[in-house]
Amino acid sequence: MPRKTLLPLVPACDAAPRRKRLAAALLAVPGLVPAVSQAQLSGAAAEPQTFGSPWDLRLAPQLDEHPQKQGGKPATFVLADHTGGTADQDLAAKGSAEIRRGNAVVKADAIHYDQDTDMADAYGKVTVANGGTTFSGPEAHLKVEANQGFMTTPKYHFTATGGSGSAERVQLLDSERSVFTNGTYTGCQCSTNPAWYIRGSEFDFDTGADEGVARNGVLFFQGVPLFGSPWLTFPLSGERRSGFLPPTFSPFSSTNGIEVSLPYYFNIAPNRDLTITPHIISKRGIFTQATFRYLSTNYSGALTGEYLPDDRIAHRNRYAIFWQHQQNFGNGFGGYIYYNKVSDNLYPEELGSTNQFVNGIQTVYQQEAGLTYNDGPWSVLGRYQHWQTLPPAVAPYGREPQLNVKYAKYNVGGFDFGAEADYSRFRITTADQPEGDRVMFNPYVSYGLYGPGYFFVPKAQLHIASYDLTTTTGGVPDQAKRFTYSIPTLSLDTGLVFDRSVRLFGQDYIQTLEPRLFYVYTPYRNQSNAPLFDTAVSDFGLAEIFTPNTFVGNDRIADANRLTAALTTRFINPATGDERARFVIAQQYYFTDQRVTLLPTEAPATARHSDLILGASVKLGAGFASETAFQYNVDNNQLVKSSVGFGYSPGERRVINVGYRYTRQNPTLSNEPINQILMSAQWPLTRRLYAVGRLNYDLASSRVVDGLVGFQYDADCWAFGVGVQRYANGLNTSGQQNSSTRVLAQLVLKGLTSIDNGLVTAFRAGVQGYTPLPPAPAPLSRFSNYD
């Protein structure tokens, strides 16, 4: 017998098949079918596309949701195998019965519907769906439009957030709020036997507020209770919200003992938040950390404060302040503040953040505020800069204050010209060091000739520096306090580019041959009176040999009469333009001695040529890449410096890095010799298990500089990681590096929370190319399982 359908106030009619009647009913009520996508088109793209005559079916680019007009009542649709009842009063539907009203759908084996009260009583395999939330159970009693009522022994699923669970009873308050009695909640897609779930005597869910509250809630993982609370709140999705974050636990250490922390997060506004984290340190006391972050269209920043009152070991109050602020005033004006301060010299070693395990202990803290202006060729910086320096670091000079102005114009009739002017007052916290003012002016002009296979760029520049010292180095009699240097520099940078087509290893390439010459001439000027405010010897490498000055900074300008010659060849994929390989060889030739030295006690450089520099970069298929650089002394037949690195990454979360660093000790330079091998990797052992490791081993001393080994397991709705790290932890009394070991762990309950005491941070810093485990899949749209 055909199924019957009945609309309120309309007699039943069973002449048409059920699907056709349902389709006709849906099409007859505009706005009944929600949009399949939240994205909205506009313009011509949003207009329906027609085919043939005006009476043909049309393709619409989107489904539009039309809200119910105020005062209007949506139509009610009833479908079933058998229907009966009294017109305009009640209705009985049996056999695959359905009631649809607005966005609400009730399905059951049998439904009794009272039209006056809008009350539906459903029995047998009941399903209630409204606004992307689905409830199923043996029976339900509710008002259809208001979505108010109750169900017994329901199972539920939030389509928009991915959460699900079961309970003894659910009280439906409206389309967004519901109360469950003696129930469970999980974010796992597998709801029959989830890896984690929360069990509570009562759950209050509000999908509109994206919040769930469990009373007498206990968090279970793999059937084991992890955490319990009489009042447990949690988000239903990944949106930020105020509340407690997962606690962290650090194992016992000789410095601090056991440490436990419990952060609380305040979601003040979409662009502001505050995290307060009390730490219980068994050997020292209660250590509190607070971080305030803010973001606006014109400014952003973060302020962190740390405080430990009456340290039980140090017997004093200890604190730290870290503030970063960026400001855009408009019209090219900006500003910034970097203020960092710790209470004592041992603070970073004993109470520093987890970043110290990766980057080493911080011993220099910047305290700086500045104003900037940028407009076309103009760039202006005014700042006040100070440093807090902890031993054994050497204190740098502060600029108290500095005003720097730069001007640059390009391609004005083929000329590039500009200038830099700078005034700085240098101060230092170290005793018996020179201090004073320096005014510097550096104008320049160049003219470039460029062609398809060549370039020719002569350049002239002038360095003027004037000093007014308030204090000089102790022990130097009659040292001048006011003096000025004026030093010109001429340079010529030129090169050619040849190319040809070649075929190597069955592949076509474009090979280039690029000879380059760089000549620089700077006359000698005695600069021994000038202090070293911001100057040091420049590194010697491919990035530095084409610069006119062998010093960085403005207190030394090297006299020069030298020529740099380099030859580069590259292999380029003609189809994509991707550079597959590059090889470089370069050397400098000196026509006169370099008399200007960093310190007056140093001897002038008398060599006639520099060390030979060789470099290579290779990228092959299947994710293989290599970077190699050598500095070789031809006269002594010695390798001065080398850096060799190989990387292999055939796919995501598959990377192997191998590197070697070598630096020969130079008696004339206070450099530390380096002879180290570095290996790091991330690699899958199974489909879900990954190994991560890093080893930095010093071959000269036969010791581990730093190391890391760990594993990560990725399941459908949870992930776990563990690692052991050996790291540098300051210097001992003899100046040797101390090392310590710590255990790292991470537990991620996807869809709920993550507990991590620095594991992912250590993996990111230790393994180049490391990729974190994937997050939980995004929840489905509320229209994904649309009925």
From Swiss-Prot:
Name of the featured protein: LPS-assembly protein LptD
Keyword field contains Aminoacyl-tRNA synthetase: no
Subunit structure: Component of the lipopolysaccharide transport and assembly complex. Interacts with LptE and LptA.
Annotated function: Together with LptE, is involved in the assembly of lipopolysaccharide (LPS) at the surface of the outer membrane.
GO biological processes: Gram-negative-bacterium-type cell outer membrane assembly; lipopolysaccharide transport
Entry keyword set: Cell outer membrane, Membrane, Signal
UniProt main location, coarse: membrane
Signal peptide span: 1-39
Parts of the chain that traverse the membrane: none
InterPro entries: LipoPS_assembly_LptD, LptD, LptD_C
Annotated Gene Ontology cellular component terms: cell outer membrane; transporter complex
Entry's family note: Belongs to the LptD family.
Compartments it resides in: Cell outer membrane
